């Protein structure tokens, strides 16, 4: 089918929205996207604008994967922001530790099981995409990384955008969402009945899924974009205020044994996620630089000020932390949309439908 006139100059261009993992910090991500919707509606005098309509592929990990599925399902970023902000406190309830020995109390809890029950998370996901919806119901191509604990391999849930795909179309969205967000120590592994497998958080392999999104264009999206080159791919990557995680030299030198250094595994998980996030970003930038297309990668994120770092954590869903996250997301959206033409260019023409 020939391209409509407004798409002719974009026939080889591929736009990807990539959403990082980060637990409760995902409110920063979705608040930023929601503010972009508000800005564009105000500037253009329109109603019902949805950021998800402007991308050929949406990829996301952990909370980013949940949000990616919601956007591809047809929800606006503002709808998802409203749901997540209301439910975050139920997903990550405040831990009622005694005044004394809180660290030991937390470790005792972890020794018996994960920190949080997955049921409130499942309920939140269901309110976003339904309990029975499948990948066949999505309006945009999607790529969701997870770790299949039963096979010991990474696994990527996808829409059936490759004619050879026969598996994921029937998979329920809620299963993929729970799989990609099952962060070790925080949530139990997710069991998917349809695949008879257990899954863990996709952040263990690709907390920033931008590079695997680029790879997807030339592998399983090649039927739809047979002439696309690396220089034709544009990626908007939204972070979660959590680019770096490191242990202090004094901690590394002074701690001995697993418990002393890693606690009950939380610091190990966060270190692994932060390191692979930096690795994927570095590989992506190198690939774009090789093709003289470094400007095709637009990254929206902020470093957390030192004094705020202890408050803005993966599982802090206190009212003050959520307000901080939402405010930072809205502020960055306003600043970048005003001065960054490359950001505004993502939203000039809606993406072509893949079905």
Curated annotation (Swiss-Prot):
GO terms for molecular function: phospholipase A1 activity. Transmembrane segments: none annotated. A motif (GXSXG) lies at residues 60-64. A motif (GXGXXG) lies at residues 21-26. The active site is at 62 (nucleophile), 201 (proton acceptor). One of its GO terms (biological process) is lipid catabolic process. Pfam families: Patatin (PF01734). InterPro entries: Acyl_Trfase/lysoPLipase, PNPLA_dom. It is an enzyme of class 3 (hydrolase). Phospholipase activity is specifically activated upon 3',3'-cGAMP (cGAMP) binding. Is not activated by the other cyclic dinucleotides 3',3'-cUAMP, 3',3'-c-diAMP and 3',3'-c-diGMP. Therefore, is specifically activated by only the nucleotide synthesized from its adjacently encoded nucleotidyltransferase (DncV). The cGAMP-activation of lipase is inhibited by T4 phage protein Acb2 (Vs.4). Its EC number is 3.1.1.-, 3.1.1.32. Changing residue 62 to A: Loss of catalytic activity. Loss of defense against phages P1, T2, T4, T5 or T6. It catalyses: a 1,2-diacyl-sn-glycero-3-phosphocholine + H2O = a 2-acyl-sn-glycero-3-phosphocholine + a fatty acid + H(+); 1,2-di-(9Z-octadecenoyl)-sn-glycero-3-phosphoethanolamine + 2 H2O = sn-glycero-3-phosphoethanolamine + 2 (9Z)-octadecenoate + 2 H(+). Disruption phenotype: Deletion of capV suppresses cGAMP-dependent growth phenotypes resulting from overexpression of dncV. Disulfide bonds: none annotated. Belongs to the patatin family. Effector phospholipase of a CBASS antiviral system. CBASS (cyclic oligonucleotide-based antiphage signaling system) provides immunity against bacteriophages. The CD-NTase protein (DncV) synthesizes cyclic nucleotides in response to infection; these serve as specific second messenger signals. The signals activate a diverse range of effectors, leading to bacterial cell death and thus abortive phage infection. A type II-A(GA) CBASS system. This is cGAMP-activated phospholipase.
């Amino acid at each position: 089918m020939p391209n409509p006139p407004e798409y002719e100059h974009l026939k080889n261009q591929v736009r990807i929205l990539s959403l990082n993992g980060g637990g409760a910090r995902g409110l920063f991500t979705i608040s930023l996207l929601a503010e972009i919707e508000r800005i564009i509606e105000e500037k253009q005098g329109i109603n019902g604008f949805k950021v998800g309509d402007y991308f050929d592929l949406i990829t996301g990990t952990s909370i980013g994967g949940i949000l990616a599925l919601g956007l591809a399902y047809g929800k606006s970023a503002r709808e998802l922001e409203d749901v997540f902000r209301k439910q975050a406190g139920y997903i990550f309830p405040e831990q009622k530790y005694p005044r004394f020995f809180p660290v030991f109390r937390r470790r005792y809890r972890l020794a018996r099981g994960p920190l949080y029950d997955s049921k409130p998370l499942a309920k939140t996901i269901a309110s976003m995409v339904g309990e029975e919806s499948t990948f066949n119901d999505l309006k945009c191509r999607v790529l969701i990384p997870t770790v299949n604990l039963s096979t010991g391999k990474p696994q990527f849930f996808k829409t059936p955008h490759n004619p050879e795909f026969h598996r994921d179309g029937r998979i329920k969205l809620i299963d993929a969402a729970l799989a990609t967000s099952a962060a070790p120590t925080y949530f139990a592994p997710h069991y998917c009945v349809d695949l008879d497998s257990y899954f863990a958080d996709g952040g263990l392999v690709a907390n920033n899924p931008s590079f695997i999104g680029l790879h997807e264009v030339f592998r399983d999206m090649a039927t739809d974009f047979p002439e696309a080159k690396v220089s034709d791919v544009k990626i908007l990557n939204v972070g979660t205020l959590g680019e770096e995680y490191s242990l202090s030299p004094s901690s590394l030198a002074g701690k001995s044994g697993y418990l002393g250094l890693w606690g009950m595994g939380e610091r190990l998980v966060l270190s692994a996620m932060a390191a692979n996030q930096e690795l994927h970003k570095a590989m992506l930038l190198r690939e774009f630089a090789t093709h003289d297309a470094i400007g095709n990668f637009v990254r929206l994120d902020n470093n957390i000020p030192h004094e705020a770092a202890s408050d803005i954590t993966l599982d802090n869903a206190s009212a003050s932390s959520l307000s901080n996250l939402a405010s930072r997301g809205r502020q960055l959206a306003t600043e970048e949309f005003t001065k960054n033409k490359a950001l505004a260019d993502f939203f000039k023409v809606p993406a072509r439908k893949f079905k």
